[in-house]
């Protein structure tokens, strides 16, 4: 295509995007079609990638395709494997796309579709994709080192140890929240529990099949896996309807918690080829296939958004999560716009598979844009269902139906209707029946709500093929595999971080080839996130209300730390005139997270502040005036949970401020030095036969 043709294409895309955004903005007080949001989003993503991503690659970072990458330099067929860019894009996307882009936008829908949509689009273009791309570049230039090692190398050993401790603590919180979403989705759901449990022996079979029966036949085993996944969903319906089998898969939240802790330990110590790799194949195909199917379904169905652009809860009084639009919307959405967790993948993991530095923009910037698109579709799925159903599913049980309520559904319908979102008990019972569940009341965590929206979209788009219950449990399986893949990989990553920390005390514990050291570190990791998971599951307010804000604050603070590192590297590269690219999102993230952290820790409002909530419930215990919806032990649990969350929030705030001071100190020192001081691996030219190397490595990979 000639230059004028290219200009015409981008002009048309710009006009389409502007028109779609204008239509959304001008239709105030009217219900609009979800298609407008999808069109506007795709146009913005394409324009951002083509222009802003390219600007960062060429001008800010001066990406050099002739420079040898660590994957080529250390090509060992194990950790360092130069990988085809399309294959690597899939691996990177599978690693970064956890629960955040699925759940955060669903929870954010409490305030209406408009605030979440704006932040998802602006945040990913200016912050999230920038972080992923720049961290990938920085790590690639330093032999694929991890985030903590990069901070240590560029800012000094003290800052490095602080960053490593913070990364481990944040990873623990992230894993606890991810696991809690699975628990909330599977509690008292025999169909869902059976289907997810079925994938464990299936993954083990696939691992043995690939290792011993048909080595290297990934496509073949993936087809087998897909067939058995469909069988698992169908047979799950039979199990749920069986009075004999259903009780064997009907578990409480606490029972599922201990099962997940045990699973997490076993999955982290088993060989990667036996469970993790096959589950990756399953989840990657399911993720990409479902995302494409959902996008096509929205195009076919063109559903109307029933959630208003702004709800009454923008004032911070919402039942799903508490706090004003600023700053809490920005920490609630989390991964769909910007995620610190991605920095742990973009450093240390993906750089060791990057065949050419010139592909970093496609993998880093492009991969994050894809995740944001997933988040947009999650937002759409949540906003097309009846708002009354949305609030009945996501509000805490203590709010909808206090302990001892005879008719929970009727009570929930009455409470939600009093908020201005009219809903009847018959409607709630009908939806529960259609999706094959005993109840949909207070199915907090976002995942069940997303599954309901997805089920109706896919059911309608395919002309009624299979019933709604099938598609609901298909969506639950999709979400569970999405999340469990991250729990598996995250537990292993946390184990490596913990072994690095334990190695400071006892060098022998740092050895990853030592079975006792591995078992000890893994046990400590799963007990750490398992503890927070248990606290969230038994929390009378649903867990999400307290743990998700802590997760959001910690995750966004980690993103701020990663962007601080990127800004420091630009100063040390003598490219400080471009440092604004990293400093602007850093400043915004620090403002949001420190404001949110301060309010969650110290706000006197008992609906917002952790300490205020703890003091309120402690006063009830001391006075003996226990509300009917709680027991004394539940109040004691709430007091402890909130005080612990306050302590962690304060710790994360101190860490990010200290690292900000180290960043300023390092940047000022770099300005005084007339020469570049960035500690990059010395330049080596890319071998001429790099394409042949990538092709050969494909088999090893």
From Swiss-Prot:
It is found in: Cell inner membrane. Keywords: Cell inner membrane, Cell membrane, Membrane, Peptide transport, Protein transport, Stress response, Transmembrane, Transmembrane helix, Transport. Residues 28-33, 108-117, 182-189, 239-255, 302-324, 394-395, 461-463, 545-550, 599-643 are periplasmic. Pfam families: CstA (PF02554). One of its GO terms (molecular function) is pyruvate secondary active transmembrane transporter activity. Residues 1-6, 55-86, 139-160, 211-217, 277-280, 346-372, 417-439, 485-523, 572-577, 665-701 are cytoplasmic. The chain crosses the membrane at residues 7-27, 34-54, 87-107, 118-138, 161-181, 190-210, 218-238, 256-276, 281-301, 325-345, 373-393, 396-416, 440-460, 464-484, 524-544, 551-571, 578-598, 644-664. It is a multi-pass membrane protein. GO terms for biological process: cellular response to nutrient levels; cellular response to starvation; peptide transport; plasma membrane pyruvate transport; protein transport. InterPro entries: CstA (IPR051605), CstA_N (IPR003706). Induction: Induced by carbon starvation. Induction requires the cAMP-cAMP receptor protein (CRP) complex. The carbon storage regulator CsrA regulates translation of cstA by sterically interfering with ribosome binding. Belongs to the peptide transporter carbon starvation (CstA) (TC 2.A.114) family. Involved in peptide utilization during carbon starvation. This is Peptide transporter CstA. It comes from Escherichia coli (strain K12). The gene is cstA.
């Amino acid at each position: 295509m000639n230059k004028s043709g290219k200009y015409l294409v981008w002009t048309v895309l710009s006009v389409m995007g502007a028109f779609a955004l204008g239509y959304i903005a001008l239709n105030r007080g009217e219900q609009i079609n979800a298609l407008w949001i999808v069109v506007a989003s795709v146009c913005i993503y394409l324009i951002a990638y083509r222009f802003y991503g390219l600007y960062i690659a060429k001008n800010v970072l001066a990406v050099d395709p002739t420079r040898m990458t660590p994957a080529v330099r250390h090509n060992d067929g194990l950790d360092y494997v130069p990988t085809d860019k399309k294959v690597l894009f899939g691996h990177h996307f599978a690693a970064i796309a956890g629960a955040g882009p699925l759940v955060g936008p669903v929870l954010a829908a409490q305030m209406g579709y408009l605030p979440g949509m704006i932040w998802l689009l602006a945040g990913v273009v200016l912050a999230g994709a920038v972080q992923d791309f720049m961290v990938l570049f920085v790590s690639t230039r330093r032999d694929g080192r991890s985030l903590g090692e990069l901070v240590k190398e560029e800012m000094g050993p003290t800052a490095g140890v602080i960053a490593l401790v913070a990364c481990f603590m944040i990873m623990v919180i992230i894993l606890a929240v991810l696991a809690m979403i699975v628990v909330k989705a599977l509690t008292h759901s025999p169909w869902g529990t059976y289907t997810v449990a079925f994938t464990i022996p299936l993954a083990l079979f696939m691992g043995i099949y690939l290792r011993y029966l048909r080595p290297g036949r990934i496509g073949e085993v993936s087809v087998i896996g897909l067939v058995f996944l469909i069988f698992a969903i169908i047979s799950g319906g039979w199990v749920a309807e069986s009075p004999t089998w259903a009780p064997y898969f009907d578990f409480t939240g606490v029972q599922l918690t201990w099962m997940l802790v045990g699973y997490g330990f076993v999955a982290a110590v088993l060989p990667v080829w036996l469970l993790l790799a096959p589950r990756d194949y399953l989840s990657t195909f399911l993720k990409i296939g479902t995302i494409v199917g959902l996008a096509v379904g929205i195009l076919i169905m063109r559903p109307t958004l029933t959630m208003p652009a702004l709800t009454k809860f923008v004032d911070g009084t919402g039942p799903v999560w508490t706090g004003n639009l600023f700053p809490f919307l920005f920490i609630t959405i989390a991964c769909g716009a910007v995620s610190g967790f991605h920095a742990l993948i973009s450093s240390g993991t993906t750089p060791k598979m990057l065949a050419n530095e010139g592909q970093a923009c496609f993998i880093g910037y492009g991969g994050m844009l894809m995740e944001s698109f997933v988040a947009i579709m999650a937002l759409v799925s949540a906003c097309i269902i009846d708002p009354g159903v949305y609030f009945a599913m996501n509000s805490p049980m203590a709010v909808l139906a206090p302990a001892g309520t005879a008719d929970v559904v009727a009570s929930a319908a009455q409470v939600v209707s009093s908020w201005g979102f009219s809903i009847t008990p018959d409607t709630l019972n009908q939806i529960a029946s259609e999706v094959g569940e005993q109840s949909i009341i207070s199915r907090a965590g976002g995942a069940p709500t997303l599954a309901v929206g997805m089920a109706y979209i896919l059911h309608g788009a395919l002309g009624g093929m299979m019933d709604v219950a099938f598609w609901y449990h298909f969506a639950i399986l999709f979400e569970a595999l999405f999340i469990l893949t991250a729990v598996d990989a995250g537990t292993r990553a946390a184990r490596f971080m913990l072994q690095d920390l334990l190695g400071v005390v006892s060098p022998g514990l740092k050895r990853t080839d030592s079975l006792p050291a591995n078992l000890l570190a893994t046990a400590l990791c799963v007990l750490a996130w398992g503890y927070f998971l248990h606290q969230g599951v038994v929390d009378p307010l649903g867990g999400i209300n307290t743990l998700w804000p802590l997760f959001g604050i910690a995750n966004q603070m980690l993103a701020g730390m990663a962007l601080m590192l990127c800004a420091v590297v630009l100063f040390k590269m003598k490219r400080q005139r471009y440092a604004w690219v990293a400093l602007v999102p850093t400043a915004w993230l620090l403002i949001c997270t420190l404001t949110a952290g301060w309010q969650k820790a110290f706000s006197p409002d008992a609906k917002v502040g952790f300490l205020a909530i703890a003091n309120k419930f402690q006063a009830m215990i001391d006075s003996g005036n226990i509300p009917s919806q709680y027991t004394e032990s539940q109040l004691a649990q709430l007091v402890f949970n909130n005080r612990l969350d306050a302590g962690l929030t304060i710790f994360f705030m101190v860490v990010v401020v200290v690292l900000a001071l180290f960043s300023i100190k390092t940047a000022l020192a770099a300005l005084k030095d007339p020469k570049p001081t960035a500690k990059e691996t010395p330049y080596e030219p890319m071998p001429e036969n790099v394409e042949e190397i990538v092709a050969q490595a494909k088999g090893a990979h």
